[in-house]
Each structure stands twice: as C-alpha cells, then as structure tokens.
Amino acid sequence: IATVDCSDYPKPVCTLEDMPLCGSDNITYHNKCYFCNAVAHSNGTLTFSHFGKC
C-alpha cells in the first residue's frame, strides 16, 4: 500500500512541480506539498488514495 509522509507539513509555499496525486476527497492535488497542506488543514480526515490524477 502506497503512503505519503506529511509529517513535515504544512509548508507556507509549494513548488509548481507537476506530480499529481489523488486524495480520499476525489480531488487531484498538483503535488505532494499541496496534498499534505490540505491534509494538515483537514484535521486528519483527508487521506491518500493513489498517485496520478483522480
């Protein structure tokens, strides 16, 4: 099972690196930074679904 380590987040600025991944909310995040910031702000309700677009 693939996981994403978000322990270093949230970060104030994300790069524009294009490595999409899909969250449990069925939203495609541009890269790990955007996803992990969303996880941090979701109070643990958002989880990783899979790499690539939803």
Curated annotation (Swiss-Prot):
PROSITE patterns: KAZAL_1, KAZAL_2. Glycans are attached at N43. The record marks L16, E17 as: Reactive bond 3. It is found in: Secreted. It comes from the Eukaryota. Keywords: Disulfide bond, Glycoprotein, Protease inhibitor, Repeat, Secreted, Serine protease inhibitor. GO terms for molecular function: serine-type endopeptidase inhibitor activity. Residues 4-54 form the Kazal-like domain. InterPro entries: Kazal-type_SerProtInhib, Kazal_dom, Kazal_dom_sf. This is Ovomucoid. It comes from Carpococcyx renauldi (Coral-billed ground-cuckoo).
